[in-house]
Amino acid sequence: MLPELLFIVLLLLSYLIGSISTAIIVCKMFNLPDSRTQGSNNPGATNVLRIGGKKAAAITLIGDGLKGAIPVLIAHYLAFNMLNVTWVILVTFLGHVYPIFFSFKGGKGVATFLGALLALSYLTGLSFIITWVFVAKVLKISSLSALISTVLTPVYFYLITNNLASTYVIILICLWIFYTHQSNIKRLLNSQENKIN
């Protein structure tokens, strides 16, 4: 198969993998309310934690992370360069945020992005995690931890990989994460965002 055609097939596969909603599947497995209609109405690990507890949330987090990692690992196996892999990450992320299987209404994409980062540049992924944990311990607000980690991720990525073209794609994803967190940002500005218990 021609490399260009193979890349298009991989992008399509990545979008479909991203479109699998771990939160919805986990909620059905544990007989929990639909995460799209309960809590924050977001099919993500944080909302599953609210409505279903730590076990269900952990499975959701791992599942969403694997969704991000698997397409990256496939791209590595097929020997695509880093720029192409970052486009794979973007498409997988878009699958999570706009899943074809669930009326294009998905999660916010942080866990899927993190899983992809760990597979692409584990030092960048670890830097994201360390930042998130530090901010969460100090400020005790999950969304703010995610947003601060997201802001710093392109800096970490460029310093670690020295790949400017790929960094631009990472910046695009990070901007999109801010877009998916609009409601959180409004609550943060109004001092109404929930804190981590």
Curated annotation (Swiss-Prot):
One of its GO terms (cellular component) is plasma membrane. One of its GO terms (molecular function) is acyl-phosphate glycerol-3-phosphate acyltransferase activity. It catalyses: an acyl phosphate + sn-glycerol 3-phosphate = a 1-acyl-sn-glycero-3-phosphate + phosphate. Keywords: Cell inner membrane, Cell membrane, Lipid biosynthesis, Lipid metabolism, Membrane, Phospholipid biosynthesis, Phospholipid metabolism, Transferase, Transmembrane, Transmembrane helix. Its EC number is 2.3.1.275. The chain crosses the membrane at residues 6-26, 58-78, 82-102, 116-136, 157-177. It is an enzyme of class 2 (transferase). Pathway: Lipid metabolism; phospholipid metabolism. Catalyzes the transfer of an acyl group from acyl-phosphate (acyl-PO(4)) to glycerol-3-phosphate (G3P) to form lysophosphatidic acid (LPA). This enzyme utilizes acyl-phosphate as fatty acyl donor, but not acyl-CoA or acyl-ACP. Probably interacts with PlsX. This is Glycerol-3-phosphate acyltransferase. It comes from Ruthia magnifica subsp. Calyptogena magnifica.
